[in-house]
Amino acid sequence: MNKQNIQKTLVLLPTSALLAGCLDATDNPANKITPTPNADGKYNIIFITTDQEAYMEQYPAGSNYAARERLRKLGTTFEKHYACANVSTSSRSVIYTGRHITETCMLDNTNYAFVNDMSRDLPTVGDMLRDAGYYTAFKGKWHISEDTESLEEYGFSDWTEGNMYGSVWEGYKEDGTIADHAIDWLKSKGKQLNNDGQSFFLAVNFLNPHDIMYFNETPGTYIAGEATPAPDDPVYKKSYNVPVPASWNESFDKPGRPAAHKEYNKQWQDWVGPSPTDSLGWQTFRDYYFNTIQDEDNHMLVLLKYLEKAGLLNNSIVIYTSDHGEMQGEHGLKGKGGNIYENNIHVPLIIYHPEMKGGRHCYNLTSHLDLAPTFVDIATAGNVQQFSAITQELHGHSLMPAVKNPATDIRNSEGALFCFEMISMIDGDYVMNPSLKPAYRADMNKRGFVRGIITPDYKFARYFAPVKFNTPADYEALWADNDVELLMCGTDETENLAWPKDNNANQQLVELMNQKLNALIQREIGTDDGSETKKGYKGGVEMYDKNKYDQ
Protein backbone atom coordinates (compact mmCIF):
# COMPACT_ATOMS: atom_id res chain seq x y z
CA MET A 1 0.00 0.00 0.00
CA ASN A 2 1.61 3.31 -1.05
CA LYS A 3 1.49 6.55 0.93
CA GLN A 4 -1.41 8.01 -1.01
CA ASN A 5 -3.54 4.89 -0.42
CA ILE A 6 -2.60 4.89 3.25
CA GLN A 7 -3.83 8.46 3.62
CA LYS A 8 -7.12 7.60 1.89
CA THR A 9 -7.58 4.57 4.14
CA LEU A 10 -6.95 6.55 7.30
CA VAL A 11 -9.80 8.88 6.47
CA LEU A 12 -12.20 5.93 6.48
CA LEU A 13 -11.07 4.47 9.80
CA PRO A 14 -12.57 5.61 13.12
CA THR A 15 -10.20 7.24 15.57
CA SER A 16 -10.58 4.35 18.00
CA ALA A 17 -9.35 1.93 15.37
CA LEU A 18 -6.35 4.10 14.66
CA LEU A 19 -5.48 4.42 18.33
CA ALA A 20 -5.88 0.71 18.86
CA GLY A 21 -3.20 0.17 16.26
CA CYS A 22 -0.67 2.42 17.95
CA LEU A 23 2.27 1.17 19.97
CA ASP A 24 3.13 2.72 23.27
CA ALA A 25 6.88 3.21 23.07
CA THR A 26 7.07 3.51 26.86
CA ASP A 27 5.93 -0.06 27.58
CA ASN A 28 8.41 -2.89 27.86
CA PRO A 29 7.87 -5.71 25.36
CA ALA A 30 10.74 -7.62 26.97
CA ASN A 31 8.36 -8.54 29.78
CA LYS A 32 6.26 -10.52 27.28
CA ILE A 33 9.10 -12.46 25.63
CA THR A 34 9.63 -16.16 26.17
CA PRO A 35 12.60 -17.43 24.13
CA THR A 36 11.27 -20.31 22.03
CA PRO A 37 13.45 -21.71 19.24
CA ASN A 38 11.66 -23.29 16.29
CA ALA A 39 11.27 -27.05 15.94
CA ASP A 40 14.63 -27.23 14.14
CA GLY A 41 16.25 -25.77 17.27
CA LYS A 42 17.00 -22.45 15.58
CA TYR A 43 15.71 -18.88 15.53
CA ASN A 44 14.33 -16.98 12.56
CA ILE A 45 16.44 -14.04 11.41
CA ILE A 46 14.64 -10.83 10.46
CA PHE A 47 17.14 -8.41 8.94
CA ILE A 48 16.03 -4.79 8.55
CA THR A 49 18.03 -2.28 6.54
CA THR A 50 17.53 1.40 5.86
CA ASP A 51 19.25 3.45 3.18
CA GLN A 52 21.59 6.37 3.87
CA GLU A 53 21.12 6.52 7.65
CA ALA A 54 24.09 7.81 9.63
CA TYR A 55 24.73 6.71 13.20
CA MET A 56 23.26 8.92 15.90
CA GLU A 57 24.38 8.58 19.50
CA GLN A 58 21.21 10.39 20.54
CA TYR A 59 18.13 10.91 18.43
CA PRO A 60 17.19 14.56 17.78
CA ALA A 61 15.10 16.23 20.45
CA GLY A 62 11.48 16.30 19.34
CA SER A 63 11.70 13.15 17.26
CA ASN A 64 9.58 10.10 18.00
CA TYR A 65 11.70 7.27 16.64
CA ALA A 66 9.63 4.73 18.53
CA ALA A 67 10.79 1.71 16.51
CA ARG A 68 14.45 2.51 17.00
CA GLU A 69 13.94 3.26 20.69
CA ARG A 70 12.10 -0.02 21.02
CA LEU A 71 14.94 -1.95 19.42
CA ARG A 72 17.45 -0.21 21.68
CA LYS A 73 15.49 -1.37 24.72
CA LEU A 74 15.18 -4.91 23.38
CA GLY A 75 18.62 -5.45 21.91
CA THR A 76 22.32 -4.71 21.96
CA THR A 77 23.32 -1.43 20.30
CA PHE A 78 26.66 -1.49 18.53
CA GLU A 79 27.99 2.04 18.92
CA LYS A 80 31.02 1.77 16.61
CA HIS A 81 29.77 -0.06 13.55
CA TYR A 82 31.12 0.96 10.14
CA ALA A 83 30.30 0.43 6.48
CA CYS A 84 33.02 -1.20 4.36
CA ALA A 85 32.17 0.59 1.11
CA ASN A 86 29.99 3.27 -0.47
CA VAL A 87 27.46 3.72 -1.95
CA SER A 88 24.34 1.51 -2.17
CA THR A 89 25.41 -1.17 -4.65
CA SER A 90 28.91 -1.48 -3.22
CA SER A 91 27.86 -1.55 0.43
CA ARG A 92 24.94 -3.90 -0.12
CA SER A 93 27.18 -6.32 -2.00
CA VAL A 94 29.39 -6.52 1.11
CA ILE A 95 26.40 -6.94 3.44
CA TYR A 96 24.83 -9.72 1.39
CA THR A 97 28.03 -11.69 0.63
CA GLY A 98 30.43 -11.01 3.51
CA ARG A 99 33.13 -10.04 1.00
CA HIS A 100 34.80 -6.75 0.16
CA ILE A 101 34.09 -5.03 -3.15
CA THR A 102 37.43 -6.37 -4.41
CA GLU A 103 35.69 -9.78 -4.47
CA THR A 104 32.11 -8.79 -5.26
CA CYS A 105 33.38 -6.47 -8.04
CA MET A 106 30.42 -4.20 -7.31
CA LEU A 107 32.37 -0.96 -7.50
CA ASP A 108 29.69 1.50 -8.60
CA ASN A 109 25.89 1.62 -8.75
CA THR A 110 24.26 -0.85 -11.12
CA ASN A 111 22.06 1.80 -12.72
CA TYR A 112 25.15 2.96 -14.64
CA ALA A 113 25.52 1.30 -18.03
CA PHE A 114 29.22 0.66 -17.40
CA VAL A 115 28.58 -1.49 -14.29
CA ASN A 116 28.04 -5.24 -14.47
CA ASP A 117 25.61 -7.22 -12.32
CA MET A 118 27.10 -9.11 -9.40
CA SER A 119 28.15 -12.60 -10.42
CA ARG A 120 25.50 -15.21 -9.77
CA ASP A 121 28.29 -17.66 -8.93
CA LEU A 122 29.30 -15.69 -5.84
CA PRO A 123 27.69 -17.20 -2.71
CA THR A 124 25.32 -14.80 -1.00
CA VAL A 125 23.86 -14.75 2.49
CA GLY A 126 20.83 -16.41 0.92
CA ASP A 127 22.94 -19.27 -0.44
CA MET A 128 24.83 -19.69 2.82
CA LEU A 129 21.73 -19.81 4.97
CA ARG A 130 20.03 -22.22 2.59
CA ASP A 131 23.04 -24.48 3.13
CA ALA A 132 22.29 -24.19 6.85
CA GLY A 133 18.69 -25.29 6.31
CA TYR A 134 16.93 -21.91 6.27
CA TYR A 135 14.28 -20.61 3.91
CA THR A 136 15.49 -17.22 2.65
CA ALA A 137 13.22 -14.39 1.48
CA PHE A 138 13.84 -10.81 0.38
CA LYS A 139 11.69 -7.67 0.44
CA GLY A 140 12.45 -4.13 -0.70
CA LYS A 141 15.56 -2.56 -2.19
CA TRP A 142 18.12 -4.86 -3.82
CA HIS A 143 20.32 -2.73 -6.14
CA ILE A 144 23.06 -5.34 -6.66
CA SER A 145 21.93 -6.35 -10.14
CA GLU A 146 19.46 -5.21 -12.76
CA ASP A 147 17.02 -8.03 -11.99
CA THR A 148 13.41 -6.90 -11.76
CA GLU A 149 11.41 -10.07 -11.10
CA SER A 150 13.36 -12.73 -9.18
CA LEU A 151 16.40 -13.11 -6.94
CA GLU A 152 16.41 -16.91 -6.93
CA GLU A 153 19.80 -16.96 -8.67
CA TYR A 154 21.10 -14.91 -5.75
CA GLY A 155 19.67 -17.23 -3.12
CA PHE A 156 16.50 -15.35 -2.17
CA SER A 157 12.82 -16.14 -2.74
CA ASP A 158 9.57 -14.17 -2.74
CA TRP A 159 10.90 -10.81 -3.96
CA THR A 160 7.88 -8.93 -5.30
CA GLU A 161 8.71 -5.21 -5.23
CA GLY A 162 11.01 -5.03 -8.27
CA ASN A 163 14.27 -3.13 -8.35
CA MET A 164 14.20 0.23 -6.58
CA TYR A 165 17.21 2.54 -6.59
CA GLY A 166 15.89 5.29 -4.36
CA SER A 167 14.45 7.87 -6.77
CA VAL A 168 12.62 11.11 -5.93
CA TRP A 169 10.24 10.54 -2.98
CA GLU A 170 10.52 6.77 -3.48
CA GLY A 171 10.97 6.11 0.23
CA TYR A 172 7.97 8.28 1.03
CA LYS A 173 5.86 6.42 -1.53
CA GLU A 174 7.06 2.84 -1.10
CA ASP A 175 8.29 2.15 2.44
CA GLY A 176 4.74 1.46 3.58
CA THR A 177 4.40 -1.09 0.79
CA ILE A 178 7.64 -2.78 1.81
CA ALA A 179 6.41 -3.08 5.41
CA ASP A 180 3.05 -4.42 4.21
CA HIS A 181 4.69 -7.03 2.00
CA ALA A 182 6.94 -8.16 4.84
CA ILE A 183 3.99 -8.55 7.21
CA ASP A 184 1.90 -10.35 4.58
CA TRP A 185 4.80 -12.75 4.01
CA LEU A 186 5.18 -13.37 7.76
CA LYS A 187 1.45 -14.06 8.12
CA SER A 188 1.41 -16.58 5.31
CA LYS A 189 4.75 -18.06 4.28
CA GLY A 190 6.70 -17.37 7.46
CA LYS A 191 4.06 -18.80 9.75
CA GLN A 192 3.69 -21.92 7.63
CA LEU A 193 7.45 -22.47 7.53
CA ASN A 194 7.65 -22.34 11.32
CA ASN A 195 4.64 -24.62 11.64
CA ASP A 196 6.45 -27.08 9.37
CA GLY A 197 9.55 -26.89 11.57
CA GLN A 198 11.78 -24.69 9.41
CA SER A 199 13.40 -21.40 10.39
CA PHE A 200 13.60 -18.52 7.93
CA PHE A 201 15.70 -15.50 7.04
CA LEU A 202 13.67 -12.47 5.94
CA ALA A 203 15.45 -9.36 4.65
CA VAL A 204 13.33 -6.19 4.83
CA ASN A 205 15.07 -3.36 2.97
CA PHE A 206 13.50 0.07 3.42
CA LEU A 207 14.34 3.03 1.18
CA ASN A 208 14.34 6.02 3.49
CA PRO A 209 16.09 8.19 4.55
CA HIS A 210 17.47 8.01 0.97
CA ASP A 211 14.90 10.62 -0.14
CA ILE A 212 17.27 13.26 1.28
CA MET A 213 19.41 12.80 -1.84
CA TYR A 214 16.94 14.80 -3.95
CA PHE A 215 15.83 17.40 -1.43
CA ASN A 216 15.72 20.90 -2.87
CA GLU A 217 13.52 23.82 -1.81
CA THR A 218 14.89 26.45 -4.19
CA PRO A 219 11.92 27.72 -6.26
CA GLY A 220 12.18 27.08 -9.99
CA THR A 221 15.03 24.58 -9.72
CA TYR A 222 14.91 20.90 -10.52
CA ILE A 223 16.71 17.70 -9.56
CA ALA A 224 16.45 14.58 -11.68
CA GLY A 225 13.86 16.42 -13.76
CA GLU A 226 11.60 17.22 -10.81
CA ALA A 227 11.13 19.89 -8.18
CA THR A 228 11.74 18.14 -4.89
CA PRO A 229 10.68 20.00 -1.77
CA ALA A 230 9.40 18.06 1.22
CA PRO A 231 6.10 16.21 0.66
CA ASP A 232 2.97 17.98 1.84
CA ASP A 233 2.53 15.58 4.72
CA PRO A 234 2.36 16.19 8.50
CA VAL A 235 5.39 13.95 9.04
CA TYR A 236 7.49 16.43 7.09
CA LYS A 237 6.39 19.61 8.89
CA LYS A 238 8.56 19.25 11.98
CA SER A 239 11.69 21.28 12.65
CA TYR A 240 14.41 20.28 15.09
CA ASN A 241 16.58 22.45 17.27
CA VAL A 242 19.71 20.50 16.41
CA PRO A 243 22.92 22.45 15.68
CA VAL A 244 24.37 21.98 12.22
CA PRO A 245 27.90 20.54 12.07
CA ALA A 246 30.45 23.20 12.95
CA SER A 247 32.41 22.25 9.84
CA TRP A 248 29.57 23.06 7.41
CA ASN A 249 31.61 25.85 5.76
CA GLU A 250 35.02 24.14 5.83
CA SER A 251 37.03 25.07 2.74
CA PHE A 252 37.67 22.39 0.15
CA ASP A 253 40.98 24.14 -0.57
CA LYS A 254 42.16 23.88 3.03
CA PRO A 255 45.82 22.76 3.09
CA GLY A 256 46.00 19.03 3.68
CA ARG A 257 42.43 18.30 2.67
CA PRO A 258 42.36 15.52 0.05
CA ALA A 259 41.51 16.85 -3.41
CA ALA A 260 38.98 14.04 -3.79
CA HIS A 261 36.58 15.87 -1.47
CA LYS A 262 36.38 18.88 -3.79
CA GLU A 263 35.90 16.67 -6.85
CA TYR A 264 33.13 14.79 -5.07
CA ASN A 265 31.39 18.02 -4.07
CA LYS A 266 31.45 19.32 -7.65
CA GLN A 267 30.12 16.02 -8.94
CA TRP A 268 27.39 15.73 -6.32
CA GLN A 269 26.07 19.24 -6.90
CA ASP A 270 25.96 18.59 -10.62
CA TRP A 271 23.84 15.52 -9.96
CA VAL A 272 21.42 16.75 -7.31
CA GLY A 273 21.67 20.52 -7.21
CA PRO A 274 23.62 23.04 -5.15
CA SER A 275 24.34 22.53 -1.48
CA PRO A 276 23.09 25.04 1.10
CA THR A 277 25.28 28.11 1.44
CA ASP A 278 24.48 29.06 5.02
CA SER A 279 23.73 27.38 8.33
CA LEU A 280 19.98 28.01 7.98
CA GLY A 281 19.96 26.13 4.69
CA TRP A 282 21.76 23.21 6.28
CA GLN A 283 19.29 23.32 9.17
CA THR A 284 16.39 22.96 6.72
CA PHE A 285 18.24 20.16 4.96
CA ARG A 286 18.76 18.30 8.23
CA ASP A 287 15.14 18.84 9.30
CA TYR A 288 14.04 17.05 6.16
CA TYR A 289 16.58 14.29 6.77
CA PHE A 290 15.34 13.68 10.32
CA ASN A 291 11.78 13.63 9.00
CA THR A 292 12.59 11.00 6.38
CA ILE A 293 13.91 8.87 9.23
CA GLN A 294 10.71 9.53 11.17
CA ASP A 295 8.68 8.46 8.15
CA GLU A 296 10.61 5.20 7.81
CA ASP A 297 10.50 4.63 11.57
CA ASN A 298 6.70 4.79 11.49
CA HIS A 299 6.64 1.93 8.99
CA MET A 300 9.27 -0.03 10.87
CA LEU A 301 7.16 0.36 14.00
CA VAL A 302 4.22 -1.29 12.25
CA LEU A 303 6.49 -4.23 11.43
CA LEU A 304 7.78 -4.48 15.01
CA LYS A 305 4.23 -4.32 16.31
CA TYR A 306 3.31 -7.28 14.17
CA LEU A 307 6.36 -9.25 15.33
CA GLU A 308 5.28 -8.70 18.92
CA LYS A 309 1.61 -9.43 18.29
CA ALA A 310 2.39 -12.64 16.38
CA GLY A 311 4.82 -13.88 19.02
CA LEU A 312 7.73 -13.69 16.58
CA LEU A 313 9.91 -11.91 19.13
CA ASN A 314 9.97 -15.25 20.95
CA ASN A 315 11.48 -17.21 18.07
CA SER A 316 13.23 -14.56 15.96
CA ILE A 317 16.46 -12.58 16.10
CA VAL A 318 16.06 -9.06 14.70
CA ILE A 319 19.03 -7.19 13.23
CA TYR A 320 18.79 -3.58 12.03
CA THR A 321 21.38 -1.47 10.22
CA SER A 322 21.88 0.91 7.25
CA ASP A 323 23.98 0.49 4.13
CA HIS A 324 25.87 3.78 4.58
CA GLY A 325 25.48 7.25 6.07
CA GLU A 326 24.67 10.79 4.94
CA MET A 327 27.05 13.73 5.38
CA GLN A 328 24.32 16.25 6.45
CA GLY A 329 26.59 19.26 5.94
CA GLU A 330 29.58 17.86 7.78
CA HIS A 331 32.70 19.36 6.14
CA GLY A 332 30.42 21.17 3.67
CA LEU A 333 29.23 17.92 2.10
CA LYS A 334 25.93 16.21 1.46
CA GLY A 335 25.32 12.69 0.25
CA LYS A 336 27.69 9.77 0.60
CA GLY A 337 30.88 8.75 -1.13
CA GLY A 338 34.62 8.31 -0.91
CA ASN A 339 35.74 9.67 2.45
CA ILE A 340 36.19 8.37 5.99
CA TYR A 341 34.21 11.04 7.84
CA GLU A 342 31.86 9.84 10.57
CA ASN A 343 28.54 10.78 8.99
CA ASN A 344 29.59 9.00 5.81
CA ILE A 345 30.58 5.55 7.09
CA HIS A 346 29.47 5.26 10.75
CA VAL A 347 26.07 3.52 10.69
CA PRO A 348 23.58 2.13 13.22
CA LEU A 349 23.48 -1.51 14.24
CA ILE A 350 21.18 -3.13 16.79
CA ILE A 351 20.84 -6.88 17.37
CA TYR A 352 17.90 -8.27 19.31
CA HIS A 353 18.12 -11.85 20.61
CA PRO A 354 15.27 -13.36 22.66
CA GLU A 355 17.72 -15.00 25.07
CA MET A 356 19.78 -11.88 25.75
CA LYS A 357 19.09 -8.94 28.01
CA GLY A 358 18.16 -5.74 26.19
CA GLY A 359 19.33 -2.17 26.62
CA ARG A 360 23.02 -3.02 26.40
CA HIS A 361 25.76 -1.33 24.39
CA CYS A 362 28.89 -2.57 22.61
CA TYR A 363 31.54 0.13 22.24
CA ASN A 364 34.04 -1.98 20.30
CA LEU A 365 34.65 -1.72 16.56
CA THR A 366 32.54 -3.79 14.19
CA SER A 367 32.04 -3.78 10.43
CA HIS A 368 29.54 -4.70 7.73
CA LEU A 369 31.97 -7.48 6.81
CA ASP A 370 30.94 -9.13 10.08
CA LEU A 371 27.23 -9.40 9.27
CA ALA A 372 27.35 -12.46 7.00
CA PRO A 373 29.36 -14.55 9.50
CA THR A 374 26.88 -13.43 12.16
CA PHE A 375 23.93 -14.68 10.12
CA VAL A 376 25.68 -18.01 9.55
CA ASP A 377 26.61 -18.31 13.23
CA ILE A 378 22.94 -17.93 14.15
CA ALA A 379 21.83 -20.34 11.44
CA THR A 380 24.29 -23.09 12.34
CA ALA A 381 23.24 -22.92 16.00
CA GLY A 382 26.50 -24.03 17.58
CA ASN A 383 27.52 -26.51 14.87
CA VAL A 384 31.15 -25.42 14.65
CA GLN A 385 32.00 -27.73 11.76
CA GLN A 386 29.10 -26.48 9.65
CA PHE A 387 29.85 -22.84 10.49
CA SER A 388 33.49 -23.27 9.46
CA ALA A 389 32.55 -25.02 6.22
CA ILE A 390 30.12 -22.30 5.16
CA THR A 391 32.31 -19.33 6.17
CA GLN A 392 35.74 -20.67 5.21
CA GLU A 393 36.17 -18.03 2.48
CA LEU A 394 34.89 -15.12 4.58
CA HIS A 395 37.14 -12.75 6.50
CA GLY A 396 34.67 -11.12 8.87
CA HIS A 397 33.86 -12.11 12.44
CA SER A 398 30.60 -13.26 13.97
CA LEU A 399 29.12 -10.64 16.27
CA MET A 400 27.32 -13.20 18.40
CA PRO A 401 30.08 -13.24 21.05
CA ALA A 402 29.50 -9.49 21.48
CA VAL A 403 25.73 -10.02 21.67
CA LYS A 404 26.36 -12.43 24.54
CA ASN A 405 29.00 -10.18 26.13
CA PRO A 406 29.16 -6.61 24.74
CA ALA A 407 32.67 -6.14 26.14
CA THR A 408 34.01 -8.70 23.64
CA ASP A 409 36.68 -7.33 21.30
CA ILE A 410 35.67 -8.10 17.72
CA ARG A 411 38.16 -6.05 15.68
CA ASN A 412 39.65 -3.32 17.89
CA SER A 413 43.14 -4.74 17.42
CA GLU A 414 43.02 -5.16 13.64
CA GLY A 415 40.68 -2.30 12.70
CA ALA A 416 37.86 -1.99 10.15
CA LEU A 417 38.60 -1.65 6.43
CA PHE A 418 36.93 0.82 4.07
CA CYS A 419 37.25 0.55 0.27
CA PHE A 420 35.94 2.91 -2.39
CA GLU A 421 36.27 2.52 -6.18
CA MET A 422 33.46 4.52 -7.83
CA ILE A 423 34.58 6.07 -11.11
CA SER A 424 31.31 8.03 -11.20
CA MET A 425 32.44 10.20 -8.27
CA ILE A 426 36.14 10.86 -8.75
CA ASP A 427 36.06 13.67 -11.34
CA GLY A 428 33.95 16.79 -10.91
CA ASP A 429 34.60 17.64 -14.56
CA TYR A 430 33.41 14.32 -15.95
CA VAL A 431 31.79 14.00 -19.37
CA MET A 432 28.41 12.30 -19.84
CA ASN A 433 27.20 12.37 -23.42
CA PRO A 434 25.06 9.58 -24.91
CA SER A 435 26.37 10.38 -28.39
CA LEU A 436 29.92 9.50 -27.34
CA LYS A 437 31.35 5.98 -27.20
CA PRO A 438 31.76 5.40 -24.32
CA ALA A 439 29.20 7.88 -23.03
CA TYR A 440 30.91 8.36 -19.65
CA ARG A 441 34.44 9.72 -19.35
CA ALA A 442 36.44 10.83 -16.32
CA ASP A 443 40.03 11.71 -15.49
CA MET A 444 41.45 8.46 -14.13
CA ASN A 445 44.57 10.25 -12.88
CA LYS A 446 42.58 12.02 -10.18
CA ARG A 447 43.04 10.48 -6.77
CA GLY A 448 39.55 9.41 -5.81
CA PHE A 449 39.80 5.71 -4.96
CA VAL A 450 40.21 5.03 -1.25
CA ARG A 451 41.70 2.51 1.13
CA GLY A 452 41.01 3.39 4.75
CA ILE A 453 41.21 1.88 8.21
CA ILE A 454 39.25 2.73 11.34
CA THR A 455 40.80 1.93 14.72
CA PRO A 456 39.57 2.84 18.21
CA ASP A 457 41.76 5.96 18.24
CA TYR A 458 42.43 6.98 14.63
CA LYS A 459 41.19 6.82 11.08
CA PHE A 460 43.70 6.64 8.26
CA ALA A 461 43.09 6.80 4.52
CA ARG A 462 45.02 7.05 1.32
CA TYR A 463 43.41 8.39 -1.85
CA PHE A 464 44.86 7.12 -5.13
CA ALA A 465 44.15 7.17 -8.86
CA PRO A 466 42.16 4.34 -10.50
CA VAL A 467 45.15 3.69 -12.78
CA LYS A 468 47.63 3.75 -9.88
CA PHE A 469 46.78 0.98 -7.43
CA ASN A 470 49.59 0.65 -4.91
CA THR A 471 50.54 -0.86 -1.57
CA PRO A 472 53.12 1.59 -0.19
CA ALA A 473 55.77 -0.05 1.96
CA ASP A 474 57.34 3.13 3.33
CA TYR A 475 56.71 6.81 3.96
CA GLU A 476 58.07 8.10 0.65
CA ALA A 477 56.14 5.54 -1.38
CA LEU A 478 53.00 6.40 0.56
CA TRP A 479 53.16 10.05 -0.44
CA ALA A 480 54.40 9.39 -3.98
CA ASP A 481 51.15 7.80 -5.15
CA ASN A 482 48.56 8.88 -2.58
CA ASP A 483 46.91 11.80 -0.86
CA VAL A 484 47.11 10.91 2.82
CA GLU A 485 44.68 11.60 5.65
CA LEU A 486 44.94 10.85 9.38
CA LEU A 487 42.08 11.82 11.70
CA MET A 488 41.74 11.44 15.44
CA CYS A 489 38.55 9.70 16.53
CA GLY A 490 36.23 11.64 18.80
CA THR A 491 37.11 15.02 17.26
CA ASP A 492 35.36 17.14 14.63
CA GLU A 493 37.78 15.60 12.10
CA THR A 494 38.87 18.95 10.69
CA GLU A 495 42.61 18.43 11.30
CA ASN A 496 44.55 16.14 9.00
CA LEU A 497 47.33 14.93 11.27
CA ALA A 498 49.24 13.51 8.29
CA TRP A 499 49.75 16.97 6.82
CA PRO A 500 52.26 18.31 5.91
CA LYS A 501 54.40 15.47 4.61
CA ASP A 502 57.73 16.95 5.62
CA ASN A 503 58.84 17.70 9.19
CA ASN A 504 55.63 16.24 10.57
CA ALA A 505 55.71 15.30 14.24
CA ASN A 506 53.19 12.56 13.45
CA GLN A 507 55.33 10.80 10.84
CA GLN A 508 55.84 7.68 12.97
CA LEU A 509 52.11 7.47 13.63
CA VAL A 510 51.39 7.85 9.90
CA GLU A 511 53.85 5.05 9.15
CA LEU A 512 52.28 2.84 11.82
CA MET A 513 48.77 3.42 10.47
CA ASN A 514 49.96 2.68 6.94
CA GLN A 515 51.41 -0.61 8.18
CA LYS A 516 48.14 -1.46 9.94
CA LEU A 517 46.19 -0.68 6.79
CA ASN A 518 48.51 -2.83 4.68
CA ALA A 519 48.19 -5.70 7.15
CA LEU A 520 44.39 -5.48 7.16
CA ILE A 521 44.30 -5.37 3.36
CA GLN A 522 46.52 -8.45 3.23
CA ARG A 523 44.25 -10.28 5.67
CA GLU A 524 40.87 -9.35 4.16
CA ILE A 525 41.71 -8.76 0.48
CA GLY A 526 45.11 -10.25 -0.32
CA THR A 527 46.88 -8.78 -3.34
CA ASP A 528 45.38 -5.33 -3.91
CA ASP A 529 46.17 -4.66 -7.56
CA GLY A 530 42.87 -3.40 -8.96
CA SER A 531 42.12 -6.55 -10.93
CA GLU A 532 38.49 -6.26 -9.80
CA THR A 533 38.05 -3.16 -11.97
CA LYS A 534 38.34 -5.30 -15.10
CA LYS A 535 35.35 -7.35 -13.90
CA GLY A 536 33.30 -4.64 -12.23
CA TYR A 537 33.52 -2.11 -15.07
CA LYS A 538 32.67 -3.11 -18.63
CA GLY A 539 36.02 -2.79 -20.36
CA GLY A 540 37.88 -1.79 -17.19
CA VAL A 541 38.55 1.74 -15.91
CA GLU A 542 40.83 2.59 -18.84
CA MET A 543 37.82 2.39 -21.15
CA TYR A 544 36.38 5.52 -19.48
CA ASP A 545 39.60 7.52 -19.06
CA LYS A 546 39.01 10.82 -20.82
CA ASN A 547 42.78 11.34 -21.03
CA LYS A 548 42.70 8.82 -23.87
CA TYR A 549 40.33 10.92 -25.95
CA ASP A 550 40.65 14.25 -27.69
CA GLN A 551 38.70 16.75 -25.65
Model regions: which residues?
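Bacterial N-terminal signal peptides that target proteins for export
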Residues: 2-11
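Active-site-proximal N-terminal segment of extracellular/periplasmic enzymes that hydrolyze or transfer
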Residues: 28-79, 85-86, 482, 497-505
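Active-site-proximal cap/lid insertion segments
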Residues: 39-41, 55-56, 61-62, 194-198, ...
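Short, structured active-site-proximal loop/turn typified by the sulfatase FGly-forming signature C/S-X-P-X-R
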Residues: 56-92, 98-99, 103, 131-137, ...
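C-terminal, low-complexity/hydrophilic appendages and adjacent surface loops
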Residues: 144, 220, 342-343, 420-501, ...
